[in-house]
């Protein structure tokens, strides 16, 4: 495996405008070949999408999705730059796909890593630091293990980090970037709400004999 240096990642980022993590992933996937990494980013729609990410996305649409059986529902706000794009097929298809993703991921609570409150991060770190399998390990080793576990746990809570349900080689973030590259506008998932039928309601469980007895007493 090629040695992916910080300079190599920076050079690719300067050429593409893509994020550091995307550049590093592209170089890992292409054994450190910059030209192939550039092609990889373009195929993913990342190279051109990143250049648009700083532009204001104040238009868009709120989509809804009701899963089969009507037991799970989702409302999701997806933003873009113009109303024209918001009404287009690519944008509306993305809105539906991301809404379906939320319905399929009951553990997801946040759009991106940046949204996770610091107290949640501290809580997860406290849980991991206290695990029995870390006892007796040197502090520096323990920190590295915990860091990896926390990153994995936090990504489980984030919508953009989820493997896309229709193609697990992509994340939801990849999907959004691909759509942005096709459309030529910045696209942002702003917020979502997931509803589960009966969630939070305490059910009064009663067996058949008790139910019959209660009916007789009325």
From Swiss-Prot:
The keyword Cytoplasm applies. This is Elongation factor Ts. PANTHER family: ELONGATION FACTOR TS, POLYPROTEIN OF EF-TS, CHLOROPLASTIC. It is found in: Cytoplasm. The gene is tsf. It comes from Prochlorococcus marinus (strain MIT 9515). Residues 82-85 are annotated as: Involved in Mg(2+) ion dislocation from EF-Tu. One of its GO terms (molecular function) is translation elongation factor activity. Associates with the EF-Tu.GDP complex and induces the exchange of GDP to GTP. It remains bound to the aminoacyl-tRNA.EF-Tu.GTP complex up to the GTP hydrolysis stage on the ribosome. Belongs to the EF-Ts family. GO terms for cellular component: cytoplasm. The lineage of its organism: Bacteria, Bacillati, Cyanobacteriota, Cyanophyceae, Synechococcales. Pfam families: EF_TS (PF00889). Its main location: cytoplasm. Keywords: Cytoplasm, Elongation factor, Protein biosynthesis.
